[in-house]
Each structure stands twice: as structure tokens, then as C-alpha cells.
Amino acid sequence: MTVNTLERTIFEKEEIRVIIRLPKYQETYYSYDYQRKVGDQATLNTFLECRVYPLLEKIGLSKNHVEVIDGHGNFPHMHTKLDIIRSSYVK
């Protein structure tokens, strides 16, 4: 799975825009295997700690290699609830 495909898969399942700081077509050899999205009342920090950071560790990356961007193009605070971030995207 390429980085681009991984980012798109996360967005389709979680409705959260994640940017991984690697070349878009670099192979990651890992996939995003979760079937259900994280609940709306969870914070961005919880989402990253439980889902994204463990995946980055498997790829061999640190937490500094990922960003989350809301629908306004901003980097939300780590304590922002996911429903706020999800509702910021144009549907």
C-alpha cells in the first residue's frame, strides 16, 4: 500500500484527513485494518495514540511524521473532539 493509498483509506474509514510525511508513492507494506471509526467524542490525541502512531511505529516513523488537517486547512489542537474535526470538512 502506498502512502497516498494509506492516507485515503484512513480518511474513508475515519473521516479524518491524515498527512504522512513521506513521498506519496512510497510503499508502506502496512495497511489500515480497522473496520469501525473511532467515536465522535474521542479526542484527536486518542485517535492518534490508538490508531495512527502504532501504525507509524510499524513503518519505522516517529510521531513527527504525521499531521492532521481539518476542513479549514488548520492543524487542530490535540484535545479537539473528532466530531468537531469531521464536521469541518465539506461533504
Model-derived features: positions:
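Basic helix-extension-helix modules of the SAP/HeH family
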Residues: 1-91
